[in-house]
Amino acid sequence: MNNFLCIQKIGFMAKKEKEEMDKKIMKHPLIFCIAIITMGMLIFANPTTATEPVEQQGLVDKARVTFENFMADEQNFGEWFRKNLHEAKGLLIIPNLLKGGYIVGGSGGSGVLLVKDAKTGLWSQPAFYTMGSVTLGLQIGGEAAEVVMMVRTQKAVDKLLTSSFKLGGDASISAGPVGGGAKSNVMTDIISYSRSKGAYVGVSLEGAVIATRAQWNQAYYGKAVTPVEILVENSVSSPGSTKLIEAVQRAFN
């Protein structure tokens, strides 16, 4: 009986101490606010660290470097590239198209697509794409190639807004000219330009399958978003794409 009364007394004292502490906190708003802020910091500290689009931003930055390298070329190829750039309604830039050995097998890589607004002349935010399942008849060892595709027709732009399509089937494609004497009489929907080890090479991408990277688009823009929303409706944006867009915009000014 004595033990029971003792336990009751201890419980009553603990409860009273808690009530006294609560009263002190409520009487001092500053203490109360600090307590709430501290709890919030513990719960929500660094909420975006794990979801920062590091890979996606890296690809955007590499795409800018690739485009600037193509624009800065002082050989005949660069002159042809710059001369025909004004025809582009879209640009698909793949900084790292991987190939292996004597190309009789597959290759692939990821890239970003930007589309020009026909009314304003402004370029869109980048959307992420992947290209694969292509057979290339070119010996470049195990090196990677940089690729820039000029999308020249609205038909090709519309195909790129779908989930996937095949080059050469859904839209015609040809390799950009190499060396001097190249004529700007190409009539295909898309022209591809490739560079490996700093040298420009004619690479046929016919048969390649291009598909959207929905998860990368979501990671980069913070929500599920379609190519149409990114490229046409301009419903999302990222500060990380500013330098790439500015580099492309300068080329058309």
Ranges and model annotations:
Residues 4-5:
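Short hydrophobic targeting helices and cationic amphipathic motifs
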Residues 51-253:
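Small-residue-enriched, tightly packed secondary-structure blocks
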Residues 17-34:
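Bacterial N-terminal signal peptides that target proteins for export
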Residues 44-50:
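Sec/Tat signal peptide C-region and signal peptidase I cleavage site
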Residues 33-43:
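Bacterial N-terminal signal peptides
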